Amino acid sequence: MKKFVSILLILTFIFTLTSTVSSAYGTKSVAEGSLTTSSEHTVNARSAFLMEAETGETLYSYNENERFSPASVTKVMTLLLIMEGLESGKIGADDNVTVSAYAASMGGSQVFLEEGESMSVTDLIKCTVIASANDAAVALAEHLYGSEKTFVTKMNKRASELGMENTFFENVTGLDDTTTNHLTSAKDIAIMSRELIKYDMIRKYSSLWQDSIRNGEFILTNTNRLVRYYDGCNGLKTGSTDKAGYCMSATAKRDGMQLIAVIMGAETRDVRNAEARSLLDYGFANYALYSLPERMLEEVPINYGSKGATAIYSAPFKAIIEKGKKENVNMIFEIPESIDAPIREKEQIGKVIYKLGDNVIGESSIYSLDNIEKASIGKLFASIIKSMFY
């Protein structure tokens, strides 16, 4: 029977900052409720949500599950499916798309595509990301799945896969003059935004203030003014209609921490921008992303193995911690005194539990570095004889 030793180390340390995503290495995200979020911070909007992107930790919420019309913030999901289509090879960035009459007929924000006009997927993405062009969004949707109707079915399927419990899409643009159930929530917008900003192309274009298409003849200006005026802002999407009010998913990164601030239903563009700035300011002022890299630990003895011990290492760890409290972080190592062979390389043999005060803020796995088979009977017998005489 394996005996586990819990070693409590109370450390005063500064975590090494890193932007490497650690979920693939066995790091468990911060436990819900382990952070103290402000009940005093208020927003002038129908709903709001603040998330840290790497851990998915909620830093602020207000009416976050209430369903409202998102206007052009809808295009976060539209663009996510396009990025996934590029990633899978279903479409190519250099594909030339012939604009349909339906795509060219889109009103609202647009780049005035004409029926029969040819434009590359990359340029259509730029138009959608930077200028929030409805005609470009529809052209992309038709290119990937043949029709907007089929594309919307895929949007709703993807929303379900992501756990967006309060979302239903009726089109790819967010135009809501004739929609009856095209709704989502601030939390769901943050969830799909978190997925979208994983893509380099999105981060590249959503952080630009201006770009151009048609050989420089048509200037694209970002609908997100925070890109120009807010330090660290790198996206993401704005939207407004009479029904939706003024909405935004604003992303910004400082000191290695990527925040997503969602505002829904503000009364004016200026109010929306101010509330998004205020929410981002709150996040950067009160929280920080700290991390520990992958690191080697002491060897663990192996019983009945072809090798007497295995080196072990702990996976990287990331957590959001309230500023000023890092000195209170404790680490509990749960490591077996010994392990019976066979064991496999990267086999989990223990874990590190991280605590801040009484709250568990996360844990990371401890793995074996070696692949050790069970020793043969002859080798075991030889080891016994050797131990008797030496």
Protein language model regions, located:
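Sec-dependent N-terminal signal peptides of Gram-positive bacterial secreted proteins and lipoproteins
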Residues: 2-23
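Residue-level preference for short coil/turn positions at secondary-structure junctions
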Residues: 9, 44, 345-348
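Active-site-adjacent loops and short helices of periplasmic peptidoglycan-processing enzymes
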Residues: 21-200
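Residues in and immediately flanking transmembrane alpha helices
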Residues: 15-16, 88, 291-294
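Structural motif marking the loop-to-transmembrane transition
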Residues: 1-2, 70, 121, 377, ...
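Hydrophobic alpha-helical segments, especially transmembrane helices
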Residues: 3-4, 76, 254
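Domain-terminus/edge residues, biased toward the C-terminal soluble/receptor-binding domains
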Residues: 164-168, 180-390
